[in-house]
Every structure is written in C-alpha cells, then in structure tokens.
Amino acid sequence: PVGLGSDISGGPVSSVWETARLALVAARLRASGTDPDLAPEARSHHPGDRVDAVTAFWLATAGGADALGLDVGRFRPGQRLDAILVVPGDDTSAIAPWPGEDEAPARRLERLVHGTSRADIADVFVDGRRVSGARR
C-alpha cells in the first residue's frame, strides 16, 4: 500500500492538505520532467506518473490508513471516524464556491485539495469525538 503522511518528521508540514498539494507538484514534475535543455516532449520518461487531486486525496486518507494498517480513512459503518469538517472561512476563501456554480463532486474535491487552509477547518474529530477546530 502507498499513502501520504503529514507528520513533521516525514515532511515539512503537518497539514494533510499541503501534503496532498506537494504530492501533486512532485508527481507533475516527475511526469513533465525538469531538464530545461530538453524539449518538453523529451524531458520525462514517466508521463504516466501524474497524480490528480482525487488520487492525492485518497493517498492522504484511505491510502495512508491502508499503509499503516489502520481502520480509518473511509466513511463506513463500524470504522473509526477521524475527520475534519471543512467550511469556507469567508467569501474570499479559495474553497468558496462561485455564486451559481454547480460543481461535480470531483471538481469540488479538487478545489478542496488545492485550496483548503487552516482557516477553513471548522472542526476536527478523532475516533468520533470533536477535539478541536480553528474556529472553535
């Protein structure tokens, strides 16, 4: 199993959202190549390594749980609930929907992965209990 970790010893940030964003950037660099002396089509030997936001989110949740053998990371009956409630902090939040915009679920998740910040986290739940939140 493969997952993303967000503890400080495993990376530079503790945010699961930032970890997912860094995975997107790293995968894009690997897929696109980084040698400026080569033409874009000749830069990469790994074009299939690109990761989308849905995959990055899965790696940061269910993938991480699977890699560690933990019974979390999914909304299923009988499974422990470790979750965060994400609500746009205000109208200027990067995750606030545009007026009249009707987004597909994958697009909404992409917006969350790319834009969620601490100010957007309303509540944190560990094992089903509310433990904290940026706006508590």
What function would you assign to each model-found segment?
Residues 1-92:
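His/Asp/Glu-enriched, well-ordered alpha-helical/loop segment
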Residues 80-135:
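C-terminal cap of metal-dependent C-N hydrolases
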